[in-house]
Structure formats: structure tokens, C-alpha cells
A protein has these predicted regions:
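C-terminal capping alpha-helices of c-type cytochrome domains
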Residues: 113-129, 141-170
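Surface-exposed patches in mature extracellular/periplasmic domains of secreted proteins
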Residues: 41-44, 131-136, 166-173
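Bacterial N-terminal signal peptides
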Residues: 6-15
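Electrostatic cytochrome c docking/interface patches
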Residues: 18-35, 47-53, 69-72, 109
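Acidic helix-start/capping segments at beta-turn-to-alpha-helix junctions
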Residues: 44-67, 173-176
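Positively charged n-region of N-terminal signal peptides that target proteins for export
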Residues: 1-5
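Electron-transfer interface patches adjacent to heme c in soluble/periplasmic c-type cytochromes
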Residues: 59-118, 142-152
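The canonical Cys-X-X-Cys-His
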Residues: 30, 36-46, 119, 155, ...
Length: 177
């Protein structure tokens, strides 16, 4: 019995990263900002649960799943001028097709190489990394740009503290001309 307990804890050390203690107050505040801002609503894919769609927390904040290839969106009318995917991570409308990006700190597919200033500028300006293409609907950057710089820094610190998830989100598709 003693061997099993020791073996369990030894394996647990390899299965999970070392516990670094309580998160800093900034990371705790960042988690509050991310949760209150509803970032999981679009950046965490939905999966079908026993009571209907629910967030797939194994993919928390990883954006549109790279393995989910969508058909062309249905025709839109004035009455129905935008549609969303079943994962709630892809959206089509007059702006084209937009995909929720990977907000995890994965260096290749997420925001792992972003600097704090890139993140703040993106939210304040509505441009990818603060200088790139426009951030597309339904991302409510127009509302988030009113967050304080300290709240945006906290949100970025929190996002950089979560586990990285490798997930290459498809590129934005402009509207057909």
C-alpha cells in the first residue's frame, strides 16, 4: 500500500507541472477580466454535453479547432445577417468569415510570441497585434478598448499563465466580391 501511494505521487509529479503557489494578484485580476469579458464564450470551443452545448475546457481559449473544417456559410438575408458555427468559434456575415483566435500562450499557434504592448494595442486599436488586419466581428474590441491599461495588462498576464494548446486557427476569409 505504501508503495502505491509513493508511486501515485511520483507519477503525479510528471503528469502535472510543478505548482508555483498562488497566482499573483495581477493574474487573479486577469482571470476576472477574462471571465467577465466572456472570452471563453467564443475562444473556447463548444462540445455537445448531456444537456446540450457546453465549453470544451480541455481546449480552453484555444480558438476555432483546426480539425473542424466548415462548409460554406448559408446565404444571408437582412433578417438573418450573420451565422455562427456549432463550436461558437467561427462566424460569417457581411465582413466575411472570422474565426476566434488561439489565446493560449502556444508560441507557434497562439499568443506565445506576443508582447504585452501588442495585446494592449490590438484591443485598443481593433487591429491584429495592434498593426495588422482589422479584428473582425463578433469580437467586441470596441467595448474592451475602454478597459484600463492595468486590466488589459492583467488579462494578458493571465492568458500567458494558462497552459499552451497547439491549435492553428484558420485565417480570416474576406467577403466574396
Amino acid at each position: 500500500m505504501k508503495f502505491r501511494v509513493v508511486a501515485f505521487f511520483a507519477l503525479a509529479c510528471f503528469a502535472y507541472p510543478a505548482f508555483a503557489g498562488d497566482p499573483s494578484p495581477q493574474i487573479k485580476r486577469g482571470q476576472q477580466v477574462v471571465l467577465a469579458g466572456g472570452c471563453n464564450d467564443c475562444h473556447t470551443p463548444l462540445k455537445m454535453g448531456s444537456k446540450g452545448p457546453e465549453p470544451d475546457m480541455s481546449r480552453m481559449l484555444s480558438g476555432h479547432p483546426e480539425n473542424v473544417v466548415l462548409p460554406p456559410p448559408p446565404p444571408l438575408t437582412e433578417a438573418w445577417n450573420n451565422v455562427g458555427s456549432a463550436t461558437n468559434t467561427a462566424f460569417a456575415g457581411p465582413w466575411g468569415i472570422s474565426y476566434a483566435i488561439n489565446l493560449t500562450p502556444d508560441a507557434e499557434t497562439g499568443i506565445g510570441k506576443w508582447l504585452e504592448k501588442d495585446f494592449i494595442q490590438a484591443i485598443k486599436s481593433g487591429r491584429h497585434m495592434g498593426v495588422g488586419r482589422d479584428i473582425q466581428p463578433p469580437m467586441p474590441w470596441e467595448a474592451y478598448r475602454h478597459l484600463s491599461e492595468s486590466d488589459l495588462k492583467a488579462a494578458f498576464a493571465y492568458l500567458k499563465s494558462i497552459p499552451p494548446i497547439r491549435n492553428k486557427v484558420p485565417a480570416y476569409v474576406p467577403p466574396a466580391k
